[in-house]
Amino acid sequence: MGKSEKTSLGRSLVKHHNHMIQESKDKGKYYKNLQKKVLESVTEVSDIDAIIEQAEEAERLYTINHSSSTPLSINLDTNSSSSVIAAEEWREQQKIEEALHASSLQVPRRPPWTPEMSVEELDANEKQAFLNWRRMLVSLEENEKLVLTPFEKNLDIWRQLWRVLERSDLIVMVVDARDPLFYRCPDLEAYAQEIDEHKKIMLLVNKADLLPTDVREKWAEYFRLNNILFVFWSAIAATATLEGKVLKEQWRQPDNLQKTDDPDIMIYGRDELLSRLQFEAQEIVKVRNSRAASVSSQSWTGEYQRDQAVVGFVGYPNVGKSSTINALVGQKRTGVTSTPGKTKHFQTLIISDELMLCDCPGLVFPSFSSSRYEMIASGVLPIDRMTEHREAIQVVADKVPRRVIESVYNISLPKPKTYERQSRPPHAAELLKSYCASRGYVASSGLPDETKAARLILKDYIGGKLPHYAMPPGMPQADEPDIEDTQELEDILEGSESDDSAVGDETENEQVPGIDDVLDDLSSFDLANGLKSSKKVTAKKQTASHKQHKKPQRKKDRTWRVQNTEDGDGMPSVKVFQKPANTGPLTMR
């Protein structure tokens, strides 16, 4: 080929590249014209968001149904209270109201549908059902005795859950082993049974290597008594075993991964869990295929004609659903981060011809039992978005014993005052200030950087560096403090002396704190920051009474000022002063 001859290969590649760019631009304009929003989790709405959402929903329903709908009134004022009730009485009334409205706290149901429905009709029915569900929760929020935690408010996220529940034979609810009941949603299990009575719900207790063996035994007994299908599992340990690595975290229990004789308390490995999931799902498939008469009445008939079992993973954000699937598949197929809400759409992964896994995005279910700060400390809500860090740190301080915090971080927390309960947990301010002082975290203002310290402590709490776990209902909590000796506090307040006959002669010389000492401690109490520094204040040295008088001020000489005379003009006068002539020293001749 000569130099004068030209080819069109390069020009064709450039045209193809420009064509692909133009197609991507047109595709973006198409989605923009459809006003298609990015799928993300929404747990809280502001005033303007609620107004816009209310207007959009009302306009859609009016356009479709040609009738005015009841406006969505969302009460965003959560601080209003019409009466002042004692704290204990208010808690009792709150428990009664929660038990009374427990049945109203449901997962939104998908309305019935058929393949003959159009896309617009199905979309309108789902939005109407979701709007009715939101109104029901708003009516619960209007009750002053009920505190509803943040929950998922994005309809598209709930649609992902509906699809996973419909196509799954075995539904695996992933929970955190340190508090399984906090992450369990009983109404989700009831909804799965409403879709198909032959569907099974399995509780996958993840992060089980953070629990001692005796605690796992108690939880296994609780699950058996309540007829709950459960399996203990550790996604991090399974991934490390698959990659041939050794866990470096000292806070994880290495002895827990050893095989035990009891299959209920053992921590399953990758192959064992796959076999268990396939066995449970195949049992459901056999029952499903035997119902030939009822197949025609189902709207998803195509799913019933297959022999492949589908296992769906559902649960709260950041409990380890995607990590579990990656460990079961054997490679990273789903995104995993410490920030909740990484998974946006449900994904199907084929393990074999007989088993398929389905990963669902994490959802925050509505509940009464927890607070917003407890959800942040549990990793359900993002840590980086919190605005009040002391409340979330107080949750950590209440659940982790004082000696454990001091041992893990190698710090010394301030001791309680004499008038306080000696077994009380440390305050959030005490923990944050001690942590910042030991690490040298200082903000630009010169004060301790409590925000940075709070984020690091919360991440250690979620990751397991700060060991904590809850016990089953009806059993004493771990590291429960002893009952406070109230008689000792009464003796301190009354200034009474200790019992000489019981203690002996040695106690006669000991100083028993009296009412003056208690008042001195009360004077060091700061309402804004909890407690002041524990430095000893030295008393001022008293002087003699005859030396306490104030000396009169020395009178200054102001004779140079002009007196108020008739000839005076108010200006200072200049006195004529003639310096004597210096004739020098006298010389003797």
From Swiss-Prot:
**Compositional bias of kind Acidic residues:** 495-509
Q: Which GO terms describe its molecular function?
A: GTP binding; GTPase activity; ribosome binding
Chain segments carrying region Disordered: 1-26, 495-515, 534-589
Q: Name one GO cellular component term.
A: nucleolus
Source domain of life is Eukaryota
Choose any GO biological process term that the UniProt entry carries and state it: positive regulation of ribosome biogenesis
Q: What is this protein called?
A: GTPase LSG1-2
Q: Where is this region: G2?
A: 341-345
